[in-house]
Amino acid sequence: MELEYESKRPLYIPHAGPILLEFPLLNKGSAFSLEERDNFNLQGLLPDTVETIEEQAERAWRQYQDFRTNIDRHIYLRNIQDTNETLFYRLLAAHLAEMLPIIYTPTVGDACERFSDIYRRARGVFISYNNCDKIEDMLQNATKQNVKVIVVTDGERILGLGDQGIGGMGIPIGKLSLYTACGGISPAYTLPVVLDAGTNNQQLLNDPLYMGWRHPRITGEQYDKFVDAFIQAVKRRWPNVLLQFEDFAQKNATPLLNRYRSELCCFNDDIQGTAAVTLGCLLAASRAAGKRLRDQKVVFLGAGSAGCGIAEQITAEMRTEGLSEDEARRRVLMVDRFGLLTDKLANLLDFQSRLVQPSDSLSDWQLDSDTISLQDVVRNARPTVLIGVSGQPGLFTEEIIRDMHQHCERPIVMPLSNPTSRVEATPEDLLRWTDGAALVATGSPFAPVQFEGKTYPIAQCNNAYIFPGIGLGVLASGAGQITDAMLIAASRALADCSPLANGDGGALLPDINDIQSVSRVIAMAVAKAAQVHGVALVTSEETLSLAIEHNFWQPQYRDYRRTSF
């Protein structure tokens, strides 16, 4: 049970003078009091006026508004983060809906592609295969000692952009910013890490300013040993840490998760987080449409690790509603670039083979060729839910959506591919093609749609609704693992927060400005599930609630007292 918190008591620190101003976690800038300026040798190093954090945030907001491009806004916010983290999170708290797409998707994709060009200051730990014998030392060198949450990537599959090498570091930095802004986890407890296993991106290898290891990606046994060396070093350094795998290639993501999820508290947000938030959104949409999940027929476009992870979560929840495993799997169909996954297809990956449809069940389908397209599936299977995780734009065509709407009064359509340029269909088109009947959730942010005099808010099926609450629940409960039951509990808790499902109108998911409240609800559900399933000590609900609040950091300055090393 984790009851420690960044308390309101004075903080005793040994740093002073210019060195103190260089610590983002400790720096207050112009908000240092007159007494602190005397005690910490800051006189003359700051303007005369002592400001409040509200005044600092107002200045930062005005400066932010002067920037004309999202990438420049991203760079500006990252500069504040690297200068004064408390101010950074106070600014985010005041303008979360505006700034969330800037610090994370979709703008973070541009930042990853241009990482070496826009690099200003080091943050986190860069572990190169070239120096893999020094991993222990690298973790010891981390400026944060009491790390509780690590987000790690190898940069091979960054969003829909592919191999970005060490540019992938932008993802752990952004993800951990959301752990704090949305889930209240103190930035003092978080650490972004990139495993630099080389890159196969020739453009990066040819770039004279690329800052990573200039070498083709290592694979096979070399790669496995590299990742394992990192995991074992983390276990020795921080044995109770929560480790999140982020943007690993499909061929590595699931094997790494399966290998290590019982060895330390870890999860893969691309697989499990995406699945949890999608299931939560689908549960909410099903309630809004007046159906149980078990009665839906779901078609996926995209059968990678993310799509299959979502499908597994959906079938698991269908089973809790009374379906057998075979019945649940018959109601979830997977389509990839080779067509519908059936037992006749060769060379399927392990996680795909569990989701194939038996060929004999398709004997009455009207087909023109051996390859069963998305159009064929929609016409023959008559789905009520269509989920896109293909990374390919425009594949939910007008013909497909209109065919779906012919047999489904309120189709649920979720084009989840990121960034916006890769979305399978826009919300405006989906609503127009269904005469406003579609229940829509997207992976990227979209403005509300005006259709025939009515405003339709568009839910962003953003993992930020889920993983911060999961992290908070793990820390508060002291869970040693993240189980499937904990993830399903998170999905149900998110659905319970849906304005539309609760009959209040609006979007399928809560307003992003309410995300801290949502994270608390999810944290409680996750912590309870951890206790029920034996991966956390059993305590009262009151104790859990207290632990969640004690772990919920707020961006406020603490009083400082001088001490010696």
Swiss-Prot record:
Residues the entry annotates as binding a divalent metal cation: E246, D247, D270
InterPro entries, per database record: Aminoacid_DH-like_N_sf, Malic_enzyme_CS, Malic_N_dom, Malic_N_dom_sf, Malic_NAD-bd, Malic_OxRdtase, NAD(P)-bd_dom_sf, NAD_malic_enz_proteobac
Annotated site residue numbers, Important for activity: D270
Enzyme class: oxidoreductase
Keyword vocabulary terms for this entry: Metal-binding, NAD, Oxidoreductase
Superkingdom field: Bacteria
Annotated SUPFAM superfamilies: Aminoacid dehydrogenase-like, N-terminal domain, NAD(P)-binding Rossmann-fold domains
Catalytic activity: (S)-malate + NAD(+) = pyruvate + CO2 + NADH; oxaloacetate + H(+) = pyruvate + CO2
Cross-referenced CDD domains: NAD_bind_1_malic_enz (cd05312)
Gene Ontology cellular component annotations, sorted alphabetically: cytosol
Active site: Y104, K175
Cofactor note: Divalent metal cations. Prefers magnesium or manganese.
A biological process term (GO) from this entry: malate metabolic process
Obligatory cofactor(s): Mg(2+); Mn(2+)
Enzyme Commission number(s) of this protein: 1.1.1.38
Record Gene3D superfamilies: Malic enzyme, N-terminal domain, NAD(P)-binding Rossmann-like Domain
Residues that bind NAD(+): R157, D270, N418
UniProt record similarity statement: Belongs to the malic enzymes family.
Binding partners and assembly: Homotetramer.
HAMAP family membership: NAD_malic_enz
Protein known as: NAD-dependent malic enzyme
Source organism per UniProt: Sodalis glossinidius (strain morsitans)
